[in-house]
Structures are given as C-alpha cells and as structure tokens.
C-alpha cells in the first residue's frame, strides 16, 4: 500500500512540476508581447466624462470619443459598483498602474464583493468593449493547479 501511495504522490509531483515549467516558459512570453509594442488605449473616467460609460459608443466620431493615449503595455478597463446607479468605468493603460503584468496579462479579475472587475487586453482601443473577453490562455491552468493541489493535500494527509 505504501508503494502505491508513494507512486501516486510521485506522479502528482511530476505533473505539478511539468505544469509549473510550462507556465514559467509561456507566461513571460505573453507578458513581454504586451509590453514591447505600442497600442492605443482610451483614457477616461465616467465619473468626470460621460463618454466613458457603458455601453461605449465606439461608432462615434473620434472627436466625440474619450481621448486615446499611446500605451507601452496593456489597455485596462475597471468597473466599480457595476449594475448600480453608482457604476464608475475607468479606461487606461497599465503604465499608469503599479501592477505586475506577469500576474495579470490576459485576465479579468473580479472584485471580491462581485460588484466590479478589472480586465486587461492588448489590441488597439480594446478597452472600449463592454465585455472584455480574455483569450483563456492562462485560465485553463487554474482548475488544473487547484485539482493537483487538492489531490496532493489528500494524499499527504493520509
């Protein structure tokens, strides 16, 4: 019985190492892509500029849209108090945030209360979208990591 449990533990350890290695190789490449080429991002806050609110009028003439800025990073869209009369939308470039792109590239993060979110994208004017969709590059790793961690915890607690 001990050798069977040991073999399963070793298999899970190898699987975790492989996933970690692939993540280590893959994530810096996507982060670097986001940081090395210039894109245009909308720069506005719906608190002071109604043009920034959702739904965003991306078909309006450029003079009737919020200002664009050159960005050497990713575009960001933050929503606070979503689906309430106090909803605030802010669109900007990551160069204005104290944030590590290694952690957030291609990700939408939800506020713990569920009343807001922050999304990152890397195409021109992509932060105009009402629903930024991630490309799912890293998202598939989250359930795998959770499952492996749970299994390892179960095996080690026996």
UniProtKB/Swiss-Prot annotation:
Record membrane topology: Lipid-anchor; GPI-anchor
Gene Ontology biological process terms, A to Z: negative regulation of membrane potential; positive regulation of circadian sleep/wake cycle, sleep; regulation of circadian sleep/wake cycle, sleep; regulation of synaptic transmission, cholinergic; rhythmic process; sleep
Presence of the UniProt keyword Phosphoprotein in the record: no
Signal peptide (UniProt feature, chain positions): 1-32
GO molecular function, one term: potassium channel activator activity
UniProt note on tissues of expression: Expressed in mushroom body (at protein level); overlaps with expression of Sh/shaker and nicotinic acetylcholine receptor (nAChR) components also involved in sleep regulation. Expressed in the adult brain and head. Enriched in the mushroom body, anterior optic tubercle, superior protocerebrum, antennal nerve and visual projection neuron fibers projecting into the lobula plate of the optic lobe.
Compartment(s) of residence: Cell membrane; Membrane raft
Outcome of gene disruption: Hypersensitivity to reactive oxygen species generated by the redox-cycling agent paraquat. Vigorous leg shaking, abdomen pulsation, and body shuddering in adult flies under ether-induced anasthesia. Both daytime and nighttime sleep are severely reduced in males and females. A small percentage of flies (around 9%) do not sleep at all. A moderate reduction has minimal effects on baseline sleep but markedly reduces the amount of recovery sleep after sleep deprivation. Mutants have impaired Sh-dependent K(+) current. Weakened climbing ability of adult flies.
UniProt xrefs under InterPro entries: QVR-like, Sleep_regulator
Keyword vocabulary terms for this entry: Biological rhythms, Cell membrane, Disulfide bond, Glycoprotein, GPI-anchor, Lipoprotein, Membrane, Signal, Transmembrane, Transmembrane helix
Residues lipid-modified (GPI-anchor amidated asparagine): 127
Role according to the record: Bifunctional regulator of neuronal activity in the mushroom body, and possibly other regions of the brain, that acts as a signaling molecule required for homeostatic regulation of sleep under normal conditions and after sleep deprivation. Reduces neuronal excitability by enhancing Sh/shaker K(+) channel activity; possibly by stabilizing Sh/shaker to increase protein levels, accelerating its activation kinetics, slowing C-type inactivation and enhancing recovery from inactivation. Specifically affects the A-type K(+) current.
Cited PANTHER family: ATILLA, ISOFORM B-RELATED-RELATED, PROTEIN QUIVER
Protein name: UPAR/Ly6 domain-containing protein qvr
Gene (UniProt): qvr
């Amino acid at each position: 019985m001990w050798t069977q449990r040991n073999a399963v533990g070793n298999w899970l350890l190898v699987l975790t190492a492989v996933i970690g290695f692939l993540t280590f190789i893959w994530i810096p490449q996507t982060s670097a892509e986001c940081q090395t080429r210039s894109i245009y991002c909308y720069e506005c806050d719906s608190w002071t500029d109604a043009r920034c609110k959702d739904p965003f009028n991306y078909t309006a003439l450029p003079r009737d849209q919020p200002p664009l800025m050159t960005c050497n990073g990713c575009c960001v869209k933050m929503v606070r108090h979503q689906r309430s009369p106090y909803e605030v939308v802010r669109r900007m470039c990551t160069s204005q945030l104290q944030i590590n792109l290694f952690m957030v590239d291609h990700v939408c993060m939800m506020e713990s209360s569920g009343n807001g979110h922050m999304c990152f994208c890397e195409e021109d004017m992509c932060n105009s979208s009402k629903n930024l969709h991630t490309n799912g590059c890293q998202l598939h790793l989250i359930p795998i990591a959770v499952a492996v961690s749970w299994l390892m915890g179960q095996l080690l607690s026996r």
